[in-house]
Amino acid sequence: SLSGELFRAVAENTILREKLMGVYPKKPDRDRLLAGCTCAAERGVNEALFKVRIRQKFCTDTSEQLFSFLLGAVLCADVERLRRDGRGRRILVGGSDPLRFAYAFLLRECAGLAAEEIPEAISEYAAAYGAEQIALALEKRKNG
């Protein structure tokens, strides 16, 4: 998905950049990830983004806590979709932290899925491996 790009666009190109520009913790705050995802699921992503702004202006949240809440809110739609469509499937989460950690954590905690994190060194090759597997399956189908 484009959630990582959406997150960066919001964090760096909106009024939220005041406390989020350049913030990129290796491991997000788990409680704030859950709170952001829950807020977006219950009230929508726009209200969750507004809540980040309110907390930025009137609360003592750290930049890392705001980052985590925002990340949870932005990833919520992907988590909800996989909750509906991912039952019974093996879910491997690649990429780099903090997104990899956040996705896997939210899939386990919010969606009840057994998501596994792929080490960054391995996930670098996951797209090529996946493309190869698709090509092999298509070739097999074509040849009967």
Walk through the language-model features, giving the residues of each.
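Glycine-rich phosphate-binding loops at beta-strand->alpha-helix junctions
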Residues: 88-106
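Structural alpha-beta junctions
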Residues: 108-118
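Generic structural signal for well-ordered, non-membrane alpha-helical segments
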Residues: 3, 42, 64, 68-72, ...
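Adenine-nucleotide phosphate-binding core of ATP-dependent small-molecule kinases
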Residues: 38-81
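Short, surface-exposed connector motifs at secondary-structure boundaries
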Residues: 83-90, 113
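Glycine-rich phosphate-binding/hydrolytic loop that grips phosphoryl groups
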Residues: 7, 11, 15, 73, ...
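Glycine-rich phosphate-binding loop plus the immediately following alpha-helix
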Residues: 1-39
